[in-house]
Amino acid sequence: MAPNTSTMDEAGLPAERDFSFRILTACFLSLLILSTLLGNTLVCAAVIRFRHLRSKVTNFFVISLAVSDLLVAVLVMPWKAVAEIAGFWPLGPFCNIWVAFDIMCSTASILNLCVISVDRYWAISSPFQYERKMTPKAAFILISVAWTLSVLISFIPVQLSWHKAKPTWPLDGNFTSLEDTEDDNCDTRLSRTYAISSSLISFYIPVAIMIVTYTSIYRIAQKQIRRISALERAAVHAKNCQTTAGNGNPVECAQSESSFKMSFKRETKVLKTLSVIMGVFVCCWLPFFISNCMVPFCGSEETQPFCIDSITFDVFVWFGWANSSLNPIIYAFNADFQKAFSTLLGCYRLCPTTNNAIETVSINNNGAVVFSSHHEPRGSISKDCNLVYLIPHAVGSSEDLKKEEAGGIAKPLEKLSPALSVILDYDTDVSLEKIQPVTHSGQHST
């Protein structure tokens, strides 16, 4: 999303250094574009190829994100890279269309990230309600809203030139229109109104929503982990403690600290995962959107406050686009997609059979934690791969639980973000993606 663009021919480097710099820039930008294309194409191909990935409503949002990032890699990044390497904008009147695509695709990517965070929060905070109401139709409505907003704040203002700052007359009376140089550098100075309003819609409001949702998700996950840890400690305590043969009084037995350490490690890794999700997004896009709001307030002299030189601004632009190359790694590298990618790339034979173990945590009638596992044939695409599933005991509202006990919902809830898969211990993973509703008795609903 780079409406304020300029090329790097102002660096003032000697000819040889300038040529070397352009070569290095070309190599780096080519790798970035190719990695973005490869990652997002794999996500799209996996969803198209494997039916079980299409059966999950949450993957609709992941595929929408991949499409928006793929468009960034096809319609936006290559043309800016050409301008960076050539030192000028070589595509002439294509500038306005490119700017519109840039704003639309970047905004769609960010709004899809926001929708994913809301979807994940709803799935973990109200699993029964989520199972009933998050239908494919509801998902398509949310996706349509994200894309519609992206189009509305991009093509309409750009085509009507609402996004451009009004030309100013300098004190010497010599007027120079921004249009005079537009064919050479595609430099569009945004109006203050458009810069602030578009930044609010494209970034600041979505990032505020994401902070709230992921903070809430962490708190809910923390409660789940501590609840399971308490059940584990109770089971170990009951097993280790024996009664005396004489009077039957319980013998004092020491509490093991291993369960407390494991609980702390689980919470820490959940926090790390959520921090990576938010940290990558904010680090990539925040510098650009801060500068995007500052530049319209910059005066004619670059030494004034709010002014940013063209090279720094270009770096911020590419930082934002780099987020599109990282999204497939963060949001689509859960077990489901990893197996699909391995099959698509033909490298699943390199994976040992032990990696196909599926371990599930459940609670029996006595409230004890039970671990069960089975193995999948090597190379097969399983819905559940090498994960330990957290149980959201009493996460749903009491009203939802009553309806569930009355026989309302039959299917287990198998939804939470691919981005929220974290390691519990050295051998297994915990995934907030797979959450099965439980009743008051501690049993899974079936």
Swiss-Prot record:
SUPFAM superfamilies associated with the record: Family A G protein-coupled receptor-like
Keyword entries, A-Z: Cell membrane, Cell projection, Disulfide bond, Endoplasmic reticulum, G-protein coupled receptor, Glycoprotein, Lipoprotein, Membrane, Palmitate, Receptor, Synapse, Transducer, Transmembrane, Transmembrane helix
Statement: the UniProt record of this protein carries the keyword tRNA-binding: no
Tissue-specific expression: Brain, in the striatum, the nucleus accumbens, and the olfactory tubercle.
Topological category with respect to the lipid bilayer: Multi-pass membrane protein
Superkingdom field: Eukaryota
Segments in the Extracellular topological domain: 1-22, 87-95, 163-192, 300-312
Transmembrane segments: 23-48, 60-86, 96-118, 138-162, 193-218, 273-299, 313-337
Residues modified by glycosylation: N4
Biological process, per Gene Ontology: adenylate cyclase-activating dopamine receptor signaling pathway; adenylate cyclase-activating G protein-coupled receptor signaling pathway; adenylate cyclase-modulating G protein-coupled receptor signaling pathway; adult walking behavior; associative learning; astrocyte development; behavioral fear response; behavioral response to cocaine
Main location: membrane
Localization per record: Cell membrane; Endoplasmic reticulum membrane; Cell projection, Dendrite; Cell projection, Cilium membrane
InterPro entries the record matches: Dopamine_D1_rcpt, Dopamine_rcpt, GPCR_Rhodpsn, GPCR_Rhodpsn_7TM
Residue ranges, Cytoplasmic side: 49-59, 119-137, 219-272, 338-446
Sites of S-palmitoyl cysteine lipidation: C347, C351
Annotated family: Belongs to the G-protein coupled receptor 1 family.
Name the record gives this protein: D(1A) dopamine receptor
Species of origin: Rattus norvegicus (Rat)
Organism lineage: Eukaryota, Metazoa, Chordata, Craniata, Vertebrata
